[in-house]
Each structure stands twice: as C-alpha cells, then as structure tokens.
Amino acid sequence: IALVALLVAVPIGLMAAVYMAEYAKPHVRSIVKPALELLAGIPTIVYGIFALITLGPWLRDLSAALTGGSPFIQAQCIFTAGLVMGIMLIPVVSSLSDDIITAVPKAMRDGSLGLGATRSETIKKVVLPAALPGIVGAVLLTASRAIGETMIVVLAAGVAAILTINPFEAM
C-alpha cells in the first residue's frame, strides 16, 4: 500500500514543487503553498472516509464501465487505499521538496543560465542534482509516514487486512 502511495505522491509532489519553486509567479506561489500546507493538516480519518464513500465506488464503477461488465477494481482494495494515501502525502512531498529546491543558491542558477542553458535545462542539470540529497530525505520522510498511517488503510481496505497479491482485488 505504501508503494502505491509513493508511486502517486512522489512524481506529483515533485512536479508541484518544481513548478512552485521555479515557474510560479510570487502571487500564485503565495496562494498555492499555504493551500498545500493546509491539505497536509487534514486528518487521516477524513481521507479514509473519502476513500470508503467516494473514491472506492467510483473506481469500481469506472473499471466496470471500461470493461463493459464486471469491475476489475474492487471498491475496497489495496489500490484504492494506496491512491488515497498518495493523495494525502502529496502536500508533504511538495512542501518539503519546494523548500529544498528554493534553498539552492541563485548563483548556481545564474551560472547555468549565463552559460546559455535554458530554464528547463538549468532545472534538470543544476537545480535538481543540487537538491537531490534533500529530496531523497523528503521522500524517505514521506515513505515513513506512508508506512505509519493505518487508519486510511483500515477504512479503505474494508476493515479486514487480508493481503492479496492482486492490488485490485478486495481485501
């Protein structure tokens, strides 16, 4: 479940962090960053009930519509729990990574741009490698939170933790 959560949270959180740190205008950043940090404060039980009542049945119905018959995703499965946990962890990854990317010295960015690199090349070749140790720490912190969260899994997995190999099968 933590693996599914990390597969959801890390790419989206890193992309949001890069956007906020490098591309967003100060006005947009002043709105988006506090909103993301506010999302990090939502209790786990709220996410669990959201998974149980809304997301699980929606994924089941979507998979039934895609196959034209029986659903291949059950409402209460590892995938649903991991997806909701990933949504819950996006603000953590994003906020920590944004702070780390913002801490990269401006001189490194200016040096890269002065040598003729584009903005995206500077981010890819200079900023992210310089911020990598901190980003890895943020991902490890997020992974430990994902492993530690249990309430969302209990609710989204149908209150019976019988693990199966198939992440789309009901638990």
Stretches found by the model and what they are:
Residues 9-12, 36-44, 72-98, 129, ...:
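Faces of alpha-helical transmembrane segments in polytopic inner-membrane proteins
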Residues 3-4, 8, 12, 16, ...:
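Hydrophobic alpha-helical transmembrane segments of multipass integral membrane proteins
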Residues 12-51, 95-96:
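Cytoplasmic-entry segments and transmembrane alpha-helices of multi-pass inner-membrane transporters
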Residues 11-14, 24-28, 96-110, 119-121, ...:
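Transmembrane helix boundary and interhelical loop/hinge segments in multi-pass membrane proteins
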